[in-house]
Amino acid sequence: MRVVIAGAGTAGCVLAARLSADPGIEVLLLESGPHYRAGAWPPELAHAFRIIKETHDWGFTAQAGASPRGVHVPRGQVVGGSSITNATIALRGLPEHYDEWASFVSGLDWNAMLPWFRMIETDEQFGAAPYHGDRGPIPINRWPRDQWYPLLEGFAEAAVARGHAWVDDHNAPGAMGVGPTPFNMQGGVRRTPADLYLDPV
């Protein structure tokens, strides 16, 4: 059996890796952008918090033809897709959001999605919690507070002073407040489906 996958974004990388595990399936993965190995990205891609990219981007706008007023919608043109060009934030929705979606599409409720969240992640701070994973391919980390920029520290202090709750884990069910953002990074380096799923095969 032969399978052609158009686009090596997040879904394309995972699908190609999963299908290629079957020796009876030949997989051809097509991508118009370049392929960089983990950690060998050009400076523009290495900086996770630089959202607007001059290269490796499809140049989409929210309103086609409305230039120069159209809102830029960053979409990665590179193996790994937008997982290479985004800010690496690994933040889940709230359980009630998934339950609401399930009223339109069955199987998207929180209890149905939780096993999948757990399967794909290794949460390096909270992996032992029942709503986190500790054996998945995607590492989840939070910057230690002693490494925060002064602006972030000031924001957090001001929010707590105004009565917002401190939250250590924003991916915990019911989390609401201020605290460290979960990222899919390891040792300060972004991790993506390209290097976690595709490169090993």
Located regions from the model:
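N-terminal glycine-rich phosphate/pyrophosphate-binding loop and immediately adjacent elements
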Residues: M1-R118
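Conserved redox-cofactor binding core of oxidoreductases
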Residues: F104-V201
